[in-house]
Amino acid sequence: MASTQVVFIVTLFLYLLITRWRRKNEKSFIASEEPKQPEWRDYTPAELKEYNGSKNSLVFLAIKGTVYNVTMGSKFYGPQGPYSAFAGHDASRGLAKNSFDDEFIPDSDAEELDDCSDLNDEERQALNDWKAFFDQKYQAVGRLISPREARAAATISETEEKVAHN
């Protein structure tokens, strides 16, 4: 009879322990909100490179001029993921050619963006399919612009600011 009571007490204790642990985990899961999305903005390739998941917890990549926040897929695009080569870069050419080779990832210091105009029909279709996938799955957070475009936009802003103050 005493052994029945011991089994009952141990079972009750384990039940309470597990229930308390589950509630604690559920509360922390419920309390964690989806991270705030960055405001829409323009990114140069050098700026985009900062969002590769190593220096910054956010992971972005660009396809056909659109910058996507792929942080929620960081197990794929983050530092240890199979698509990590694309994190912080314009992934257009690599995805179109289904390749992770460095030769298909544009240099972040390049003055002009890769327009992918030399892709064949099959590669263009693959790129369009990837773009459609990213449009449905991930939040667009900006546009990829060339450093030349960024300098031109900065000059226009400075001119507008000077005119406004006069």
UniProtKB/Swiss-Prot annotation:
Q: Which UniProt keywords apply?
A: Endoplasmic reticulum, Heme, Iron, Lipid biosynthesis, Lipid metabolism, Membrane, Metal-binding, Phosphoprotein, Steroid biosynthesis, Steroid metabolism, Sterol biosynthesis, Sterol metabolism, Stress response, Transmembrane, Transmembrane helix
Q: Gene Ontology terms, cellular component aspect?
A: endomembrane system; endoplasmic reticulum; endoplasmic reticulum membrane; membrane
Where is the major localization of this protein? endoplasmic reticulum
| The keyword Ion transport appears for this protein | no
Alphabetized Gene3D superfamilies for the sequence: Cytochrome b5-like heme/steroid binding domain
Protein's membrane topology: Single-pass membrane protein
- Record bears the keyword Methyltransferase: no
The molecular function GO annotations come to:
enzyme activator activity; heme binding; metal ion binding; steroid binding
Q: What transmembrane ranges does the database entry give?
A: 4-21
Provide the positions where the record notes the PTM Phosphoserine.
108
- Induction cue: Up-regulated by sre1 in response to absence of oxygen.
Q: Which gene encodes it?
A: dap1
Its recorded name reads Cytochrome P450 regulator dap1
Give binding positions for heme: 138
Q: Which organism is it from?
A: Schizosaccharomyces pombe (strain 972 / ATCC 24843)
Give a short account of what the protein does: Required for sterol biosynthesis. Functions as a positive regulator of cytochrome P450 enzymes erg5 and erg11. Function requires bound heme.
GO BP: any one term = ergosterol biosynthetic process
Quaternary organization = Interacts with erg5 and erg11.
About its domains, the entry says: The cytochrome b5 heme-binding domain lacks the conserved iron-binding His residues at positions 77 and 101.
Question: What is the similarity comment for this entry?
Answer: Belongs to the cytochrome b5 family. MAPR subfamily.
The record's subcellular location field reads:
Endoplasmic reticulum; Membrane
* Domain named Cytochrome b5 heme-binding: residues: 42-145
Q: What happens when the gene is disrupted?
A: Cells are viable under normal growth conditions, but contains a reduced amount of ergosterol and elevated amounts of the ergosterol biosynthetic intermediates, 24-methylene lanosterol, ergosta-5,7,24(28)-trienol and ergosta-5,7-dienol. Deletion mutant is sensitive to the inhibitors of sterol synthesis itraconazole and CoCl(2).
